[in-house]
Amino acid sequence: MRTDKINYYLDIAETVLERGTCLRRNYGAIIVKNDAIISTGYVGAPRGRQNCIDMGVCVRETLKVPRGERYELCRSVHAEQNAIINAAREDMIGAAMFLVGKDAKTGAYVENACACSLCKRMIINAGIIRLIIRNNKTHYTEINVADWVSNDESVSGVMGY
């Protein structure tokens, strides 16, 4: 049976996450416009810096920082950010981003995954209009990015995931 397009792109994002170097959670992101892949990104330290997986230590894990908090302590650049950084803005306007996250230890899909507040702002400014996030192998959530603009979480004080 032929895979539908959304799961096809989510499968590719899931393959991209296998390059991730985080000891906690790995994400893969791809940006697609007009059925062409514009860019990919995965979690990893900035170019030239040592990755957590190579160092064998995660500062946020050592400090027991909960998910969605204190990202300034993290060495990594998020998958969404790397996908945006590696693309030209004019190619991203009107595009969709596909995102898959897995626990680095168990390989289980990240429950209730969503872009963090910084990634949301970058996605908005990149001109991406849809975010599709895999919940499990067959189910996904589709987010209209315009909803993030009209429901500004920074005004309500709700941040993080």
Protein language model features and the residues they cover:
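Short, basic/aromatic recognition patches
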Residues: 1-27
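Short glycine/serine- and small hydrophobic-enriched flexible loop segments
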Residues: 15, 33-36, 85-88
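Zn2+-dependent cytidine deaminase-like catalytic core
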Residues: 3-10, 39-161
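General secondary-structure propensity
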Residues: 1-2, 15, 32-33, 66-69
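Short beta-strand scaffold segments in enzyme catalytic cores
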Residues: 26-41, 132
